Amino acid sequence: MNIQNRIWSSLALSLWFNLLFAQEVKFQKSISFSYETGPLISNGTDWGKEIKDAVDYKALDFQIGWRKISNTTFNYLYRYPTMGFGFNSTLKNYEEIGMPQSIYGFMEIPFSIKGLNRRVSFGYFTQLGVGFNLKPYDSLANPANKYIGSRVNGYINLGFSSRFKISERTDFQASLGLKHFSNGAAKKPNAGINLFPLNLSMNIKLGDINSIPSNSLDVPKKTLKSFWNLALYTGIRNYEIGDPTYFRGGLGLNYLVEPAYKYRLGLGMDLFWAQGMRLRFPEQSFSFKDQTSLAIVGTWEWQLTERIFVPIGLGAYLYRNELNQEISWFYERVGARYRFNNNLSAGMQIKAHKAKADFFEFTLGYTILGKR
């Protein structure tokens, strides 16, 4: 496992650990066992269709969760979500992609508080973690798999769920989600593996049965706040199959306002730098500007708790260099960060062009409170 994957593994799990235990200690504990099956999504190429036809995805999943039932502001706003950890494993070792497995943190958010007391309820979920035990591309041993170039990858799963209450202790759940394995172009090829499984699970509450608060919370009125965000991005990038990996990084400056508990939004600038251009193209000469790109970026931060937030960005380049595989005039960003105090934060995002990964941004941020 290389350095980036070690960082990704520890960061993803520590984020969810803090998300679970940093706020309060009152939970309804539960475990769930599930079976899932569904198609691997082809990218439309001949080799992609070949792998899709060869992989009949079937897997087992185990989760341990904690529904937050303390009557706090964020618990109430997110309708008493369930958070926890899970392990997923395919049932078969496929010749083309190996035996994908993952360890992840998850968050399930109901669509309504009233629905939690009904026999049938609905919600949505996200899973974030580390995928491993994949069989990567090899020009001799596995030339067909151009989806993934590394054994260890980032893992994400997003979807919707429906829950049917069997008893006070037991629920049946069905969910549909999009699973994605990617190394963020740290090692090519990296088209990414996408799966669209149906998951059927049995959920069992542990210990005493604790009800969610019956009284609505009087949420304090939110005053408008503003912030300056400084960010340092670091990562690695592989440009061609079999070539070395190079450093990618950058700096960001954003001005944000916080009109509501759940989000901040604003505008800023990003400066990116790409190492290795002289090594990749020794016959050419490059200026500092050739090795950099500059962009205006709109930012939206989804606040999950007082500490955890999801940064989402859409940037437009003022200038860029296509030799650095910045293939479009705009880029997207999404990730997760943990705020250690009112100022310092750390986390990881993925920067992409038209949903095609550019690099994983391991980020250190510093926030300064603006005028109220």
Which role fits each region the language model picked out?
Residues 29-33, 81-85, 120-126, 172-176, ...:
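Transmembrane beta-strands of outer-membrane beta-barrel proteins
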Residues 33, 62-66, 105-111, 126-130, ...:
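Residues on the lipid-exposed face of transmembrane beta-strands in outer-membrane beta-barrel proteins
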Residues 27, 54-60, 79, 97-103, ...:
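Residues that define the transmembrane beta-barrel architecture of outer-membrane proteins
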Residues 194-214, 338, 357-372:
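Outer-membrane beta-barrel "beta-signal"
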Residues 71-73, 166-172, 208-211, 261-265, ...:
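Repeated loop/turn-to-beta-strand initiation elements of outer-membrane beta-barrel proteins
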Residues 29-50, 72-77, 97, 114-156, ...:
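Outer-membrane beta-barrel translocator/channel fold
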Residues 54-55, 91-100, 116, 187-188, ...:
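Solvent-exposed loop/turn segments connecting transmembrane beta-strands
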Residues 35-41, 66-68, 87-93, 128-136, ...:
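Transmembrane beta-strands of outer-membrane beta-barrel pores
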